């Protein structure tokens, strides 16, 4: 949905296989919502609780849930009337945290900034002409009411991830935390990425007994933190940038999947 990270095929398969026998799904780091949307369409009966600490993002999801048609209508008008996406991007960026605007106006601003930013990184990125052409499209806007219907039964919160951690035997938790890399990708100018405590995160997850799947960047340090968990790597690139040494570095990166339970569909 949002270009925060892509290539969720393996997590989707693993989560999907578990939800056949679960009735509660939790996602503490909602982000672009790809996994939660898939789970909602595949298992519409589930109790789904999603969360993110980044308030402009959760505000968007909450408004989309309540006013999907209105968001689509307003965005259609804005796109037709706007001749300069860069100016629209900068104006929208200034609205995100300004409570002088309505939640609907801030949600619309978030959508514009997300779709027009480099790699969809919103406040942690700059304007991208390529992204504004490819992603801020009528096709995407027209699909918003459809997404609104899918998420009607979601519980959407703006809180710390740990409130969703549980020991419930009928719950499954998918966690997609900020990656432990040099680039600060999340929050306002990367503040939420920079301040994330990875050691504390590993400790809190390890203390819980509900079934959990975590997607992370792969490193020996992370593997050591989760030494009791099943781990698997796969190639994964999550950027729109495709030139030079940066792309070469991206291609060498691996995604790490961590499970605190045994799974037949999980390859170590």
Identify what each model region corresponds to.
Residues 24-91:
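SAM cofactor-binding core of SAM-dependent methyltransferases
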Residues 1-21:
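Single conserved hydrophobic/aromatic residue that forms the stacking wall/gate
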Residues 42, 165-168, 221-228:
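Short loop/helix-cap segments at secondary-structure boundaries that form the rim of catalytic
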Residues 28-29, 51, 157-159, 175-177, ...:
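Short His-Asn-centered micro-motif
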Residues 32-35, 54-56, 116-119, 161-164, ...:
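Short, solvent-exposed loop/turn segments at secondary-structure junctions
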Residues 194-268:
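Long, positively charged, glycine-interspersed low-complexity recognition regions
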């Amino acid at each position: 949905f949002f270009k925060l990270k892509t290539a969720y095929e393996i997590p989707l398969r693993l989560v999907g296989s578990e939800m056949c026998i679960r009735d509660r799904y939790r996602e503490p780091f909602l982000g672009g919502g790809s996994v939660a949307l898939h789970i909602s369409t595949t298992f519409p009966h589930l109790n789904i609780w999603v969360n993110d600490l980044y308030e402009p993002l959760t505000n968007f999801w909450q408004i989309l849930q309540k006013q999907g048609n209105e968001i689509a209508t307003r965005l259609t008008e804005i796109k037709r009337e706007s001749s300069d996406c860069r100016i629209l991007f900068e104006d929208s960026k200034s609205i995100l945290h300004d409570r002088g605007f309505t939640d609907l106006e801030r949600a619309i601003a978030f959508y514009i900034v997300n779709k027009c930013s480099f790699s969809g990184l919103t406040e942690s990125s700059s304007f991208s002409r390529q992204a504004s052409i490819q992603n801020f499209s009528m096709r995407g806007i027209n699909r918003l009411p459809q997404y609104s219907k899918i998420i009607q039964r979601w519980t959407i919160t703006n809180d710390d991830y740990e409130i969703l951690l549980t020991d419930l035997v009928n719950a499954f938790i998918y966690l997609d935390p900020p990656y432990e890399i040099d680039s600060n990708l999340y929050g306002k100018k990367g503040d939420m990425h920079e301040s994330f405590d990875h050691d504390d995160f590993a400790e809190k997850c390890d203390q819980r007994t509900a079934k959990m799947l975590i997607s992370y960047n792969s490193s020996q340090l992370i593997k050591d933190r989760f030494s009791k968990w099943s781990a698997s790597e796969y190639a994964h690139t999550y950027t729109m940038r495709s030139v030079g040494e940066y792309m070469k570095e991206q291609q060498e990166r691996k995604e790490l999947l961590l499970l605190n339970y045994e799974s037949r569909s999980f390859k170590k």
